[in-house]
Amino acid sequence: MINYNIYRNNCSKEWVTFVHGAGGSSSIWFKQIRDFKKHFNVLLLDLRGHGKSNYKITNAFKKKYTFSSIANDIVEILKIEKIKKSHFVGVSLGTILIRHIAEDYPNMVKSMIMGGAIMKLNLRSRFLIKLSSFFKSIVPYIWIYKIFAIIIMPYKNHKESRLLFIKEAKRLYQKEFLRWFKLTSEINPLLKLFRQVELSIPTLYVMGAEDYMFLESIKVLTKEHKSSKLLVVPNCGHVVNVEKPKFFNNHTISFLNSLSK
């Protein structure tokens, strides 16, 4: 079982579950907790191999990592805590996991907030994955993470996100990195399915105006999917919740509150 923390709000029956990306941990949401727990019950979790769901715990996972099995780790926590339905907030690869949960367990997902969402890999990102695949067993994994961080978050105003990304990634083990990296083999057909199949779940995509790797595909997606909305954050890169926390918190909480009216 993965590590998780709960912040209860006795004045609310609504739950919000936060899902971080690859190489991160629940600590990336530190700028969200204070505001969100004023309005909702909050569930924070560390994906397998990340944060306090460390290597010793993940030794229990003998089988190959898949998006389905990792998504089921999250669903297991909701079932243990008897959370029948939750809003989900994710960033980067965490948005893929949330979308996977919505596909398999639509009745458990009240809404989706997708920060720095990955729904299609452009030519540059596909090349980056292929290059990393070649070097992953040759060089220390942290080198690959640093290259990813620089390419995905290249500008000066992305520095905080970039350094946080690298800091969190250093806590991973090399073997754990390789397990997660193998997920890239199933990512393209999965994302294609997500783009083709629209769910009726209210979805807000929150994308940085400078997220040149992933923004354009989300613009196309939100024009085609009626249940989806796009919010573009000015002067912001990939990790929107870290770079522009006030903007992110105000707009996402407003979105969630609007659903209950």
Question: Whereabouts are the PLM-identified features?
Answer:
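Conserved alpha/beta-hydrolase catalytic His-Asp/Glu region
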Residues: L123-S125, I142-V197
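Conserved HGGG/HGGXW glycine-rich cap/lid loop of the alpha/beta-hydrolase fold
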Residues: N5-N59
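Gly/Ala-rich beta-loop-alpha elbow adjacent to hydrolase catalytic centers
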Residues: G90-G94, I98
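Short beta-strand/loop motif that positions the catalytic acidic residue
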Residues: L199, Y205-M207
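Catalytic histidine-centered segment of alpha/beta-hydrolase-like enzymes
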Residues: C236-N249
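Conserved alpha/beta-hydrolase "acid-adjacent" motif
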Residues: Y212-I218
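Active-site loop/oxyanion-hole signature of alpha/beta-hydrolase fold enzymes
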Residues: R34, L43-V89, N250
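Flexible "cap/lid" loop of the alpha/beta hydrolase fold
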Residues: E103-D104, V109-V139
